Amino acid sequence: MAKKKIAYLQFPGSNTENETKNILLKHGMSPRGHFWNDSTEKLKYYDGFIILGGFSFEDRSRSGIIASLEPVVNELKNQALLGKPVLGICNGAQILVESGLVPGNEKFETLVSLTDNKRVVGDRIVGTGYFNKWCYIKPSENTKSAFIKKNGKPMRVPIAHAEGRFLFNKDLESEILQNSLIAYKYCDSEGNLSNDFPINPNGSLHSAAALSNLAGNVMAIMPHPERTLQNEADDIFESMKNYIDSNSKFSYKALNFESKKISLKKFNKSPKTKELLVSTIIADNEAASVEKCINSLGVKAKVKKYIHFEIDSVDSLDINSIILSLIHI
C-alpha cells in the first residue's frame, strides 16, 4: 500500500520542517514540502496537512494573520471540508485560528484569540511574554478528533511561544465546552488539571492546549509534538495516520455560532494634550507587508505605521517647546 502523502505547509519564517518530516516518516507517512506560493492545485493530491510552527511573515501585524489570508489557506478550507486531517502546530495553530478553520463556523469567521501569554498563580500575574519549557498535556475523553488516541495518557511536550493563550467570549465558551472542542489540556505528569502556572504555562482558558473543529478533522495545538525525543507525542501522529487509513465516511459539520461584529470608534484626542506622531525614516517592513496583503485582497490602499504619543502637563510647562526638543534629539 502506498504511503499517505502529508503536505507540511511552509510560509516565509516557518521552521521545524525537519522535525515534522522525521515524525511523519517514523509513522509510515510520506512528507511533502509545500510552499505558500506553490500551486494550490497540488493540495488536492495530498491525504493530509500540517501547518508548521515558526514565525510566518515574521509575525507582522499579528501572529498568523497574514498567512491566514494567503490563497493556499483558502484551498486548505476546501480540503478540510472533504474530511482531510489538518494539524496546525504553534504558529500553524495561530494560522488556523485566524483563518476560522478552528473552531470553524459556517463562514469560517475568526472566533477565537491566541493572545499574549499570562502566567498566573491565583490572582497574581507572575510572568508574561515568550516562554519555553517542557510541559504535560492530556487528551479530552469526549472530544471527537483525528488526533486523539482512545484511552490516551498524558504526554510530555515542549512549548515555545509568546502568544499561546486561548481566549474566547462567554457565548463561544459555552459552545466550545458543550461540544468538547478543547482537544488537549495542560496537566501535570499524573494528568491532574490546574489553571495555575506552572501546570498551565500561558493562562489559556480551561487550560486549553489544543482546540478542534466540530467535525474533528482540524486541530490547532500550541505545544510542539513534533519536537519530542522519546516517543512522548506519538499518539497524535499515530492517530492521524489511523484516521486516514480508516477511510471512514465523513460528513463535515460547522459550528453553529455567528460572531458579533464590533464597531470601532473613531479616535478623538483629548483637547488638553499635544499629539506627536512618529514614523520610521527607514523602510517599515510591517506596514509594507500589511499593504501588500490587503492589496492582494482587492483593497487598494497605502499603509503607513505611526506611533502615537500624547503629552500632557499638570503645570505651566511649555509643551510645544518640549515637542521641538524631542524632534531635534
Stretch-by-stretch model annotation:
Residues K292-V299, I323-S325:
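C-terminal non-catalytic interaction/assembly regions of soluble proteins
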Residues V303-F309:
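Short Gly/Ser/Thr- and Asp/Glu-enriched loop/turn motifs at secondary-structure junctions
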Residues L277-E286, V314-S316:
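Short, surface-exposed ligand-recognition loops at beta-strand->loop->(often short) alpha-helix junctions
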Residues I327-I329:
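Conserved small/polar residues in nucleotide/adenosyl-binding loops
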Residues M1-P103, G122-G127, F131, L205-H206, ...:
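N-terminal beta1-alpha1 cap of cysteine-dependent amidohydrolase-like domains
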Residues M1, P271-L276:
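Flexible, low-complexity inter-domain linkers and amphipathic docking helices that mediate domain-domain
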Residues P103-L114:
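A short alpha->loop->secondary-structure connector
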Residues D38-S39, Y45, N78, V112-K266:
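Amide-donor transfer/coupling interface in amidating biosynthetic enzymes
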